[in-house]
Amino acid sequence: MQDPNADTEWNDILRKKGILPPKESLKELEEEEAEKEEQLLQQSVVKTYEDMTLEELEENEDEFSEEDERAIEMYRQQRLAEWKATQLKNKFGEVLEISGKDYVQEVTKAGEGLWVILHLYKQGIPLCSLINHHLSGLARKFPDVKFIKAISTTCIPNYPDRNLPTVFVYREGDIKAQFIGPLVFGGMNLTIDELEWKLSESGAIKTALEENPKKPIQDLLLSSVRGPVPMRRDSDSEDD
């Protein structure tokens, strides 16, 4: 097949007839086509190392060009940052027992942007045991939140038992919420969902619950309190 780019009399005739594009236009088309092919090639390479693990990037780094290696290094750093963020986010998952001497390190210096939930309790108080049980479940559900517990008097000397259970919510060492005493928790009927909702109101955890699970009971109580006062019957008046 004759080369359409060749400077021949026949090609000149074809160009004049409009059968072949002008020579300059043809060159531009070729350059555009070459650029597209290069872009597709680069995208293919990018897709290749986007799908690779950090270990695979290390194994295959000799196969890439200098330009590819710069892009790969950017992806490697991005992957590493994502991995570290995931490890940090999921590094808890259980309730840690501390004493007073651990307070500064575990609470005040817990870390930037980190939520800490501290339960002050004592053995032998049933509601404290119930809350510890619920917190264990919530710690597994929200591994990015630091859940800790401590016997009350090891953190606060002479802390009165009547204030137990007590839950403090911290962020970056500052108290964001506090729940003190059995009445705040509603007694032994407290469910894990109710505790989750209560803690979510402080901002410490991001619950998927759409409404307070205790609300229907509260509405029922309120409706009974707000209900109409029954009218006295005439017979009641006569009996007085």
Curated annotation (Swiss-Prot):
Where it mainly occurs, coarsely classed, is cytoplasm
Ranges for the Phosducin domain? 27-181
Q: Name one GO molecular function term.
A: vascular endothelial growth factor receptor 2 binding
Its annotated compartments are: Cytoplasm; Cytoplasm, Perinuclear region; Endoplasmic reticulum
Please give the residue positions where the record annotates the modification N-acetylmethionine. Answer: M1
PTMs per UniProt = N-terminal methionine acetylation destabilizes the protein.
Report the Pfam families cross-referenced here.
Answer: Phosducin
* Expression sites by tissue: Expressed in blood vessels (at protein level).
Question: GO CC terms for this protein?
Answer: cytoplasm; cytosol; endoplasmic reticulum; nucleoplasm; perinuclear region of cytoplasm; perinucleolar compartment; protein-containing complex
- Residues with the modification Phosphoserine, per the entry, are S44, S65, S235, S237
What are the BP-aspect GO terms?
actin cytoskeleton organization; angiogenesis; apoptotic process; chaperone-mediated protein folding; negative regulation of chaperone-mediated protein folding; negative regulation of ubiquitin-dependent protein catabolic process; positive regulation of angiogenesis; positive regulation of endothelial cell proliferation
Q: Where is this region: Thioredoxin fold?
A: 92-240
What keywords are assigned to this protein?
Acetylation, Angiogenesis, Apoptosis, Chaperone, Cytoplasm, Endoplasmic reticulum, Phosphoprotein
Q: What induces it?
A: By hypoxia and heat shock.
What's the family? Belongs to the phosducin family.
Q: What does this protein do?
A: Acts as a chaperone for the angiogenic VEGF receptor KDR/VEGFR2, increasing its abundance by inhibiting its ubiquitination and degradation. Inhibits the folding activity of the chaperonin-containing T-complex (CCT) which leads to inhibition of cytoskeletal actin folding. Acts as a chaperone during heat shock alongside HSP90 and HSP40/70 chaperone complexes. Modulates the activation of caspases during apoptosis.
Complex formation: Interacts (via thioredoxin fold region) with KDR/VEGFR2 (via juxtamembrane domain). Forms ternary complexes with the chaperonin CCT complex and actin substrate, leading to inhibition of actin folding. Interacts with XIAP (via BIR 3 and RING domain). Interacts with HSP90AA1 and HSP90AB1.
Name of protein: Phosducin-like protein 3
* Native organism: Mus musculus
Q: What is the lineage of its organism?
A: Eukaryota, Metazoa, Chordata, Craniata, Vertebrata
Q: Which gene encodes it?
A: Pdcl3
